[in-house]
């Protein structure tokens, strides 16, 4: 199993370009099922989760090619198998996203109950209840979801809880349904807006994404499109914190700062100097002046749960005490035990992490437990004294494109160790 070796102490400096957003790309890849015409993606990140979605689509009969411009072209005109098998789904919970598209276009889907991140309960009930309201018949058989419908019919759906993938799945199902669908209590994440933009570029009629209510007027068919994946706000936030914990000065290009206000506001409170110009964000930080900032995660526009672990590291190096509260997922403090081995002073009680800032961290062998926990351990290693070995880095490859290359370019001493 590959590992990352980090020798801490180098201040990061320089400029990097932000990769395309995984959380925007995955539902769009699932939505290619909705059209029999080819779709071309630009700025698609090279990540393990993207590869997994390619494997799922490929197993159904999709044709996926890469052109000379490094753009991916996907054609789902010859799908012959409407099943997402367990051996693929178990590695990525977002596999459930193909459910809505398959039922809408082909009237049937057989999807293994999802696996993926080990960070608590992420129920698929919201997806299934909403699909039933659109007219689908749902059965659970031997660990699989079987959904079928002769034709989906638009209706009003009030989600019983906010779910990003639930919102996205039903958006995809509703674009080919008869009549109008109104979704309420929906996720407002920028990636939901991105999916709406993508679907509309294919000829769908989706309005209201990013607000409390999404309205979808069903159409008979969708056409092909060429679409560029927006920048990954979580990747950008992670690199900004990498600069902050090392007392560095970096610029991230190809990123929309307006999508990151919830992150940037907290970084400013921690003492970071941030300058925004068009699609660039520059961060400068004095490592000796990190201020503690309380964090409470919430659905967008609140502070993103996917940045909680990274900000925990920043708080752990602050001049004071802070509290990080996780309101979105249970069991998402598994990184704390490993961080404490490096010298952090963090106590977890329920959904709260109580943090007392320390002057420095020490390198140590640590083990990653999930994607964002992996990122937090790398951040800790960058600013720690001595050598840190991060094990089980397959987690990091699910969501960060060439992370060791980008960090090395900024001046980090980081090396990928082979199996």
Regions found by a protein language model. Give the residues of each.
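Short, structured segments at the rim of ligand-binding sites
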Residues: 1-419
């Amino acid at each position: 199993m590959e590992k990352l070796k980090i020798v801490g102490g180098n201040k990061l400096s320089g400029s990097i370009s932000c990769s395309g957003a995984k959380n925007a790309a995955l539902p769009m890849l699932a939505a290619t099922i909705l059209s029999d015409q080819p779709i071309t993606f630009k700025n698609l990140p090279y990540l393990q989760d993207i590869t997994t979605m390619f494997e799922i689509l490929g197993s159904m009969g999709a044709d996926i090619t890469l052109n000379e411009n490094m753009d991916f072209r996907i054609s789902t005109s010859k799908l012959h198998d409407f099943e997402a098998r367990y051996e693929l789904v178990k590695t990525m919970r977002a596999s459930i996203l193909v459910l809505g598209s398959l039922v809408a276009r082909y009237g049937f889907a057989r999807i293994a109950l999802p696996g993926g991140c080990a960070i608590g309960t992420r129920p698929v009930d919201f997806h299934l209840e909403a699909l039933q309201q659109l007219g689908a018949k749902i059965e659970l058989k031997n660990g699989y979801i079987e959904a079928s419908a002769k034709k989906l019919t638009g209706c009003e759906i009030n989600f019983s809880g906010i779910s990003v993938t639930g919102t996205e799945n039903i958006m995809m199902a509703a674009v080919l349904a008869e009549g109008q669908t109104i979704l309420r209590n929906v996720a407002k994440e920028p990636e939901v807006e991105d999916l709406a933009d993508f679907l509309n570029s294919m000829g769908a009629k989706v309005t209201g994404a990013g607000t409390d209510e999404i309205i979808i007027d069903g159409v008979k068919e969708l056409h092909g499109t060429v679409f560029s994946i927006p920048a990954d706000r979580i990747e950008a936030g992670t690199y900004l914190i990498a600069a902050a914990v090392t007392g560095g000065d970096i610029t991230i290009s190809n990123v929309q700062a307006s999508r990151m206000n919830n992150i940037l506001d907290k970084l400013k409170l921690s003492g970071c100097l941030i300058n925004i110009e068009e699609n660039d964000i520059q961060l400068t930080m004095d490592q000796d002046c990190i201020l503690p900032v309380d964090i409470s995660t919430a659905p967008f526009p609140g502070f993103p749960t996917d940045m909680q672990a990274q900000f925990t590291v920043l708080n752990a190096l602050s001049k004071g005490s802070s509290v990080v509260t996780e309101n979105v997922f249970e069991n998402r403090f598994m990184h704390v035990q490993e961080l404490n081995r490096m010298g952090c002073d963090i106590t977890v009680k329920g959904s709260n992490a109580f943090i007392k800032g320390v002057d420095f961290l020490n390198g140590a062998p640590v083990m990653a437990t999930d994607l964002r926990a992996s990122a937090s351990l790398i951040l800790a290693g960058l600013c720690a004294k001595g050598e840190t070995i991060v094990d089980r880095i397959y987690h990091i490859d699910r969501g960060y494109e060439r992370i060791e290359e980008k960090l090395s370019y900024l001046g980090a001493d980081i090396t990928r160790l082979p199996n």
